[in-house]
């Protein structure tokens, strides 16, 4: 059995009325983002992934959403590359690269690079990259 951890990596400092009036929860303006708080949160979420490895988790998972206060990870491949460099053993799984808006060749190169940095294999949408 393998155990992995996942969190949405939220940014909680958006006024509740702004979130509620946008029924789809997408398209919330970035005017509410404090870059200092955002940077601290990105580092905290990366540290949480390191801690998960320290606790014995087998994998960490990342997802991607845009203009959404519930997930700060708009470019999960960057986070995956950082984790590939700073983790030792844990598998990294990406859930949902938005293929319709990505250049397929560039995405393949980015993911192959992350796989090499991590020592591979690394997971994409639940499947290991081989």
Q: What residue spans do the PLM features occupy?
A:
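Glycine-rich anion/phosphate-binding loops
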Residues: 39-44, 100-113
């Amino acid at each position: 059995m393998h155990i992995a951890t996942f969190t949405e990596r939220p940014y909680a400092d958006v006024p509740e009325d702004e979130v509620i009036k946008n029924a789809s929860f997408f398209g919330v303006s970035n005017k509410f983002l404090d870059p200092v708080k955002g940077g601290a949160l990105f580092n905290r979420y990366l540290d949480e992934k390191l801690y998960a490895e320290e606790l014995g988790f087998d994998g960490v998972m990342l997802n991607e959403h845009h203009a959404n206060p519930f997930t700060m990870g708009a470019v999960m491949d960057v986070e995956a590359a950082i984790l590939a460099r700073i983790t030792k053993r844990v598998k990294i799984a990406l859930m949902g690269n938005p293929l319709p808006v990505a250049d397929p060749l560039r995405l393949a190169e980015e993911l192959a690079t992350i796989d090499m940095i991590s020592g591979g294999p690394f997971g994409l949408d639940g499947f290991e990259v081989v």
